Amino acid sequence: MTKIKDLMTADLQYCTVLDNVYEAAVKMKDANVGAIPVVDEDGETLVGIVTDRDLVLRGIAIKKPNSQKITDAMTEKPVSVEEDASVDEVLHLMASHQLRRIPVTKNKKLTGIVTLGDLSLSEQTNERAGSALSDISEGDNREEGFFH
């Protein structure tokens, strides 16, 4: 059975709680990604995630300065999965929470991120990823303040 650690992106950009929204935006631009995990000061423990949408809605659109703390814009306690999670478990979480990406951890330490794109590239999971995308795209059931 394929585990998420076999499909995730392990070499990823991340922010720490000491970063500001400008630094997050630059890292996202440089990596060409729409979201970036946020780790604690230890540089390992996942504490949040920030998306390009978060930066707009919680920063730019309300005229916050670029020096705004990343912790003011991020989603705290994001949905995440352990490395040994199954593809079905991740697809279920993506569909039920309307997420296109989920941080991957091992004992709460960030080890990677898995995206719907990662799952669609695998022959074993392509069809199921398409089904999850359909579920994600059907309406927007996100809670206010839950933007990734």
Curated annotation (Swiss-Prot):
Keyword Repeat attributed: yes
Keyword Flavoprotein annotated: no
Biased composition (Basic and acidic residues): 139-148
Stored InterPro entries: CBS_dom (IPR000644), CBS_dom_sf (IPR046342), Diverse_CBS-Domain (IPR051257)
Annotated region described as Disordered, given as residue ranges: 127-148
Keywords (A to Z) from UniProt: CBS domain, Repeat
Lineage: superkingdom: Bacteria
SUPFAM superfamilies referenced in this protein's UniProt entry, alphabetically: CBS-domain pair
All residue ranges annotated as the CBS domain in the record: 8-68, 74-130
Classification via Pfam families: CBS
CDD domains named in the record: CBS_pair_HRP1_like
PROSITE patterns tied to this protein: CBS (PS51371)
Gene3D superfamilies reported for this sequence: CBS-domain
Name the record gives this protein: Uncharacterized protein YlbB
Organism name: Bacillus subtilis (strain 168)
Upper lineage: Bacteria, Bacillati, Bacillota, Bacilli, Bacillales
Gene name as annotated: ylbB
